[in-house]
Amino acid sequence: MTDLKASSLRALKLMDLTTLNDDDTDEKVIALCHQAKTPVGNTAAICIYPRFIPIARKTLKEQGTPEIRIATVTNFPHGNDDIEIALAETRAAIAYGADEVDVVFPYRALMAGDEQVGFDLVKACKEACAAANVLLKVIIETGELKDEALIRKASEISIKAGADFIKTSTGKVAVNATPESARIMMEVIRDMGVEKTVGFKPAGGVRTAEDAQKYLAIADELFGADWADARHYRFGASSLLASLLKALGHGDGKSASSY
């Protein structure tokens, strides 16, 4: 197996196959569930808006892949600093049956100098998730933070407040995941000594098998080749799947989505 094939197979099994569009429908989510079951294995999860969780759960079960996890988003995509609303949305997502919640960190508040509200928001959402055995990923929106010190600080605050994963981006701003921001965030995980318990998720802009290979190489360099499993690493993407399948000899690499 070539290096690209090997990394593509790894990446496919680490995907949170995503649709977070304003025009999402039951039909589109059902199609996403079907795509998550591929000829070479399943994606780790799908990521959808909360209202679609019941139909996704039913579809995944009916197609014989109940183990594919369902992730959803809260405080999304704006990252406002209203803890009460973020917590209510997170509780609602859990009630819908989410296995994982990707909450947006109040990054604008941090940029304005407020470190406390981010900690408190993540901590409140973590407590709700932990009580229901739901994984919490925290989106810090690196493309808006821009500054390395801010990216580092948002990562540290999220981890201290209990994040199970730190995630680069919503996919809804001009700049999403970059290898540079990925390295900074994974270095924080390493420097805080939390690589056993905290994972990393680049999202938005990871579109090709070659892109995925680059991101996995950074993880391998920092943590060794065995670290990036589904408990420690995810790719938030949709168009990536077609490219990975093409690299693995399935399909033409064309995708209907840009995430």
From Swiss-Prot:
It catalyses: 2-deoxy-D-ribose 5-phosphate = D-glyceraldehyde 3-phosphate + acetaldehyde. It is an enzyme of class 4 (lyase). SMART domains: DeoC. It is found in: Cytoplasm. It holds the Pfam family DeoC. The active site is at D102, K167, K201. One of its GO terms (molecular function) is deoxyribose-phosphate aldolase activity. InterPro entries: Aldolase_TIM (IPR013785), DeoC (IPR011343), DeoC/FbaB/LacD_aldolase (IPR002915), DeoC_typeII (IPR023649). Signal peptide: none annotated. Its main location: cytoplasm. Keywords: Cytoplasm, Lyase, Schiff base. This is Deoxyribose-phosphate aldolase.
